Amino acid sequence: MDNRYNPKIAQRNADVLVREKVDLVIEFQTDEHVAPIVAAKYREANIPLIAIEVPHPGATYFGANNYEAGLIGGRHLGRWAKLHNPTDATEIILLALERAGSLPRMRLTGMLVGMKEVYPALENAQVSYLEGDGKLGESFEAMRKHIRTSRARRFVIGAINDPSALGALRALQEAGRSESCAIMGQNASPEGRAELREPGTRLIGSVAYFPEKYGAEIVAVALDILHRRPVPPAVFVKHQLVTPENVDHIYPNDRLTLATAPTI
């Protein structure tokens, strides 16, 4: 069933699954405010729930260690800034996805902590949060609007995901200011990896979550629950920094996929 990123549809789908008396539900529902409502439906029906990426009360969480993923990206961004960016007139910009709630926002918290841990001089930099809704278009518009009024000469940017990172990058390219920035993404999604392969890109990295491996791992957790074996309240995936230098090593099949894709 597809929730279509729509809280009303998510609730209707939950009602259907409860009526069907399923044995277990694996739920990807991204609106934090609806999570208690959806979780309560399953709890009242005694249906165990695995919540993917966004916590639901009483559910087993499966997904990112958001703070750790943020630290990985932030430390890399801090190392880059230390080598390339003097701190004067540098602004830190963090592109958020507010509706996903507090846990995904910990990616941004981790990035900010990681940057300053590696490069303490950034303690004095201005920090701005922009709402990009995790989407390229909205992040492009938010960044485009911001740089019109910002007095910063350089930008160090941490994004909640790769579409947001790319939206910020496209806005800076449009303004002719891409050389004044360094951008860190999250997810190492296909579009992010494609940008990492672009010569001279200012997307200096992204943190991989490897969703292509989720299926087998989630099924293993589901079977443990159904067989009443002990399961931790949260099962975290492993993260890895992906950069222009190692993207082909970590994702060697990307070029093969592109080479065999049909042209339209």
Residue ranges and their predicted role:
Residues Q11-R19, D23-E44, M111, S128-E195:
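Hydrophobic alpha-helical
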Residues M1-A10, D31, G63-G73, L94-G114, ...:
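Hinge/beta->alpha junction and helix N-cap segments in small-molecule ligand-binding domains
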Residues D88-E91, E123-A125, E179-A182:
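Short acidic capping loops at alpha-helix termini that bridge into adjacent secondary structure
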Residues I50, G158, A182-M184, V207, ...:
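Structural detector of well-ordered beta-strand residues that form the stable sheet scaffold
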Residues L103, M115, F210-I264:
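Hinge/cleft segment of the Venus flytrap/periplasmic-binding protein
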Residues V18, L77-K82, I147, I218-P230:
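Short, hydrophobic alpha-helical segments
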Residues P199-A208:
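Rossmann-fold dehydrogenase core element
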Residues E32-E68, E91, S189-E198:
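Flexible loop/hinge segments that line or gate small-molecule binding clefts
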